Amino acid sequence: MKNKIFNWLIIGTLVVVSHQVSANIAGWTTIGNSGVSSATDGVVTIPSLYSSVNWISTDGGVTGNVGGYGGTDGSTVTSNAFAVTSAGSALTFAFDFVTSDGTITFPDYAWANLYNASDNSLVATLFTATTNPSGSTVPGIGAGLPAISATITPNNASVFTGPGSTVWSPLGASSGTCYIDYTQGCGNTGWVGASYNVLSPGNYYLTFGVANAGDQAFDTGMAFVGTAIGGVPIEDEDVAVPEPTTIVLMAIGLAALATRRRSLISNNINGFLRA
């Protein structure tokens, strides 16, 4: 049986955790558990350009493979169809992967896929993320996970770990916990930017997913924000969008020191999302 690691000092300090969420996400179809947070919640902050972020979690998810690459249970959200009217338009968003699970035995994971709305065919796996005791969390590692097609910033993201690194209310009872100890891969990535140039005009839809692997204990989730095509938000869109404008993506510098990484990513992700 897995043993939970609690840090009671951290949990006691954070006993009042912001949890302003709504049921599911407007303009998206949910299987499992999703919501919207309108204030900083534990380790997941609200980027300064936004008033809220979307999230999905394996806590409250459905049993079985939810359309990813295997798993015991999980959740997905799928956007309404959106139009791409210019070849090469940039699909952009940012995400923050949070997991209380760890070790390579229980590689909980997250992903985002882009589909062609005309025939439901997979166009691209934009990113994957997995629990990983050492090395990269994004892109994800493990059997069955495909190569990613989006450009992510930073190009390899590991988790911030340690006491308090999994405090996030969408994880339910797993918030603030970690499987075995904090050397096994639990934690959060902070905000990671993703950009993918859609090669052909047409109608598309986007799916985000999270899944438990190996068991249904120690939940995992993901926040995401800023989904846009050519700088035009795709959320709440179920008709053709206007001709996209050129999106300005600001360069994001990688931190030289691990202690500076979070503040640099936080500052620069706002530039990444700014249209």
Where on the chain are the PLM-derived regions?
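Bacterial N-terminal signal peptides that target proteins for export
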Residues: 2-9
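Conserved short hydrophobic patches within well-ordered secondary structure
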Residues: 9, 52-54, 249-255, 275
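Bacterial N-terminal signal peptides
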Residues: 9-17
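Sec/Tat signal peptide C-region and signal peptidase I cleavage site
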Residues: 17-23
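Aromatic (Trp/Tyr/Phe) and Gly/Pro-enriched flexible surface segments
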Residues: 24-238
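A short, hydrophobic C-terminal helix/tail in secreted or cell-surface proteins
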Residues: 242-260
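C-terminal membrane-anchoring or membrane-association module
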Residues: 257-275
